[in-house]
Amino acid sequence: TQRPEYLDAFHYAKLYNEAFMNDNPGEEPVYKQEDLDLYLSGESPYTHPNVNWIDEILKKQTIAQRYNLSIQGGSSKAKYFVNFSYQNNDGLYKTDDLNTYNTNANFQVYSIRSNVDVSLTKDLLLSVDLFGRQQLRNNPGGSMSAEGLFKTLYSLPANIFPLNYGSDKVAGTNAYRKNPYGILNHSGYSKYIHSTMEASMKANQKLDFITKGLSVYASLAFDARFDNTINRSKEYMVYEYTGKNATGEDTFTTWGEPGKQANSNSFGDSKVRIFDVEAG
C-alpha cells in the first residue's frame, strides 16, 4: 500500500516556528530550542512526543485469502455440481491483544452453490438449484467511520500527544479526544451480517408423443435476504499528561467518561422473501 510521508515532530515544530515568525515578526517562537532538542532526541516522550501515526496505526500490508472447492459428477440418470467458496480480507489496522473480541476491520464471505438434475423418467427432468451466501463485516466500535479514522490519522501532528501512556491509558486532550489508538482498541466493535438464500426447482416434461420437440415445464423459485447488525461499542477516557508530583509519579488530567459496552442486536428492514411460480 502506498502511503504518504509526514513530518516528524522536530521538523513540524521547526516549520511551524518559521510560519509563525513570518506572520508575527519580532515575537518569540512558539517552540523554543529546548523543545526542538527534545523532539529530536526523544528523551521526553510524554512532554515532547514524536508519533508517526501512519506507521503506528496502519500495517504496510495485510492478508487477502480466497478458497474454492468444486465437486461434480453423475450418471445418465442424475448429474450434480457443488461449489464451496470462502473469502477473507483482514484489516489494515494494527490492534493490540487487549480484548477477547476482534476490533480490527475484517470482511468474510461464505458461499455454497448446488445444482442437481435428475431424470425421473426418460421424458421428465427435475432440476434443483440452491445457493447460499453470508457476508460478515467487522469494524472498530464508536461512531467514527473508516473515512473519518483515516482523516484523523492524516491530520494529527506528530507532537500532539503520545500513542498512549501504557495500554490502559489512552492519550488525548480536551480538544482532541479521538485518539486513533483508542478508537481501535478501546471502542469495542460492530459487526454487520448479510445473508442470502436462493432456491429454485424446475420440472420439464417432454411431449414428443404429441409433437416432436414439444415440452411443458413448471418452476418454483424462492429468495430470502436477512440483515443483522451487532453493536458492541463503548466510550473511553483519555489522559492528558500534566507532569510529575512531589514523589516523582506521573500525573494526568482525564477527559470523558468510560462507558459501558453497548449490547444491541438489530435486524434490518430489508428482509425480502419472493416466491415465483411459472409454467409454460
Where are the predicted features?
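Small-side-chain secondary-structure face that scaffolds active or pore-lining regions
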Residues: Q87-V109, R113, N139-G141, S145, ...
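Membrane-proximal, glycine/serine-rich, low-complexity loop/turn segments characteristic
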Residues: T1-T196, K202-D208
